[in-house]
């Protein structure tokens, strides 16, 4: 039975010291003080889908001194007009909020901190709220930019305890989502904003969004923003329910989904009263940084973003996405997923996305008991120019990917699987991919993906896929000397001579082949550019993610 979040759901790497720029930013996050208003922005990789809102004619908070920038002055400015800026002096200033700033959902509001303002909830109150009563109709809302939101706390009002004698029933908080911002049926545009140490309630099957929670909204777009140290039962940083989401050039680090049990409806939970609906089980724990649920929403897009060191207790260490029966599209482009962890799906859990498009991205050093990098269920998977390196399934199957019911319209092209592991002893195998592949695999390399059960299929555990111009290494299993399962019918066995994961140009780290690698000039019909954005040799391209 599949995990869910929301109203209607069912169901040993060497890492180069030359770190990706976004990771270097991430290392600085923990040292920033609460008074520092805006952390270093992530690198700009993708064209932003929105620009900062204009601030002409603003109502100004303050008269040039920190003492003039008070909570009452802020509330007066918000009440007086739709555009708010600040004049608190040259130094960073913090405005402590003692109650939630409630904004009108039908009037466009702009709040611009100028890079020096922090709203701080002291771990006691949600910071901002805007609620419209309808479902996906309202296009007005909030543009928030150049500011920090810290220590916000969503406080629940209804807790459902565990059911005596039925551990499968759901329990936890029925409300208490959105520690910094709560939005319903309203637009939210976020540009260059830092979210730190905000929290939603936990546990609970449907509460979430330690920093941001948005329900039934047509447009949530987050650009050039950082999320560090946020937590909630689901979606440690962001929770979207029936909401269209766009993420560009964002950094998510050290966020946690702290719920304690996978969510499901029916089956083992039959007879439960449920926290949010009848026959519901579980208490959350999905989506360490981001959780997205819905069938009414549109496509979800992530571009140029970095997810590092996020954790979840259940599914999707970085991001959890279920599209319910509507099979909405999900895309990841030029993004990095590194050192995330979960019980299942160390980086991603994605269900019923058609298509699920992954382009020019890197998944490295993610860990889970099963599906070290990604657990993909019922998706039409389309992967191009992507690297899976050093991901680990610690007690199960699929060191990099675990696939269930993948659609025939999918493909894997010009992709590198290297150094992934399925550890945990006997019964652990499929270090690169576990599951059925019903689509072609072309110009792809499977190199040194190792399983603890050395006598079982090491790299791929499924009936061989179709395809062409693929390379696999090694050929022999370490125990028994048998030939390993082929990942693709007719695959060539050769040592690809790949280097360690490193910054080789482009927005994401890659593993480049040596000058005399058999991957060079061995591919055909490759993507026009490689993972770094470098043009490929059209006649004789290189197998794998890097030309």
Which sequence ranges carry the predicted segments?
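Right-handed parallel beta-helix/beta-solenoid
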Residues: 39-72, 500-503
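Surface beta-loop-beta hairpin patches that serve as ligand-binding interfaces in beta-rich domains
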Residues: 41-50, 508-547
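Acidic Gly/Asp/Thr-rich repetitive segments characteristic of extracellular carbohydrate-active
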Residues: 61-85, 525
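Extracellular beta-strand-rich solenoid/capping regions of secreted or surface-exposed proteins
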Residues: 75, 79-80, 96-110, 118-145, ...
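Feature marks extracellular polysaccharide-active and adherence modules
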Residues: 87, 112-114, 120, 130-131, ...
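Glycine-rich beta-solenoid repeat tracts in large extracellular/virion proteins
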Residues: 101-104, 126-136, 157, 179-185, ...
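Acidic/polar low-complexity surface segments
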Residues: 152-174, 197-208, 253-286, 311, ...
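Predominantly extracellular beta-rich ligand-binding scaffolds that present long acidic/polar faces
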Residues: 220-221, 301-305, 323, 350-369, ...
């Amino acid at each position: 039975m599949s995990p869910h979040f929301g109203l209607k759901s069912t169901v040993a790497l060497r890492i180069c010291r030359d770190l990706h720029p976004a990771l270097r930013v991430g290392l600085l996050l923990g040292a920033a003080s609460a008074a520092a208003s805006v952390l270093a922005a992530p690198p700009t990789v993708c064209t932003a889908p929105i620009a900062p809102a204009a601030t002409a004619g603003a109502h100004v908070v303050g008269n040039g001194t920190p003492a003039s920038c008070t909570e009452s002055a802020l509330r007066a400015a918000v009440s007086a007009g739709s555009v708010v800026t600040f004049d608190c002096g040259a130094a960073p200033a913090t405005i402590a909020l003692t109650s939630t700033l409630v904004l009108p959902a039908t009037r466009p509001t702009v709040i611009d901190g100028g890079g020096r303002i922090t709203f701080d909830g002291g771990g006691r109150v949600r910071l901002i709220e805007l609620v419209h009563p309808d479902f996906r109709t309202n296009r007005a809302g909030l543009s928030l930019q150049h500011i920090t939101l810290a220590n916000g706390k969503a406080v629940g009002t209804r807790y459902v305890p565990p059911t005596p004698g039925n551990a499968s029933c759901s329990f936890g908080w029925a409300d208490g989502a959105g520690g910094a911002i709560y939005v319903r049926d309203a637009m939210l545009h976020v540009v260059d904003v830092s979210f730190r140490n905000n929290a939603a309630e936990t546990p609970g099957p449907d509460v979430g969004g330690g920093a941001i929670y948005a329900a039934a909204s047509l447009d949530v777009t987050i650009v050039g923003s950082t999320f560090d140290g946020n937590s909630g039962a689901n979606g440690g940083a962001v929770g979207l329910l029936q909401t269209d989401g766009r993420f560009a050039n964002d950094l998510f680090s050290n966020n946690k989904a702290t719920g304690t049990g996978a969510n499901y409806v029916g089956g083992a939970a039959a007879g439960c009263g449920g926290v949010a609906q009848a026959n519901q089980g579980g208490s959350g724990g999905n989506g360490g940084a981001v959780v997205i649920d819905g069938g009414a929403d549109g496509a979800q897009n992530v571009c140029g973003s970095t997810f590092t060191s996020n954790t979840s207790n259940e599914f999707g260490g970085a991001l959890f996405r279920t599209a319910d029966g509507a099979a909405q599209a999900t895309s990841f482009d030029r993004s990095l997923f590194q050192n995330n962890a979960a019980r299942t799906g160390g980086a991603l859990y994605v269900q019923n996305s058609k298509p699920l498009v992954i382009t020019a991205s890197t998944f490295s050093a993610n860990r889970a008991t099963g599906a070290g990098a990604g657990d993909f269920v019922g998706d039409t998977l389309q992967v191009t120019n992507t690297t899976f390196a050093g991901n680990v399934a610690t007690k199960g199957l699929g060191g990099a990917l675990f696939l269930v019911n993948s659609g025939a319209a999918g493909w894997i092209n010009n992709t590198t699987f290297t150094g992934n592991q399925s550890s945990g002893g006997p019964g652990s195998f499929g270090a690169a991919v576990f599951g059925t592949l019903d689509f072609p695999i072309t110009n792809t390399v499977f190199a040194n993906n190792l399983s603890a059960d050395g006598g079982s299929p090491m790299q791929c555990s499924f009936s061989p896929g179709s395809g062409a111009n693929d390379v696999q290494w090694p050929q022999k299993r370490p125990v028994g000397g048998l030939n390993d399962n082929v990942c693709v019918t007719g695959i060539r066995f050769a040592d690809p001579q790949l280097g360690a994961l490193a910054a080789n140009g482009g927005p994401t780290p890659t593993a480049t082949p040596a000058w005399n690698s058999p991957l060079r000039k061995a591919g055909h019909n490759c993507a026009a550019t490689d993972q770094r954005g470098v043009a490929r040799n059209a006649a004789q391209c290189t197998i794998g993610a890097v030309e």
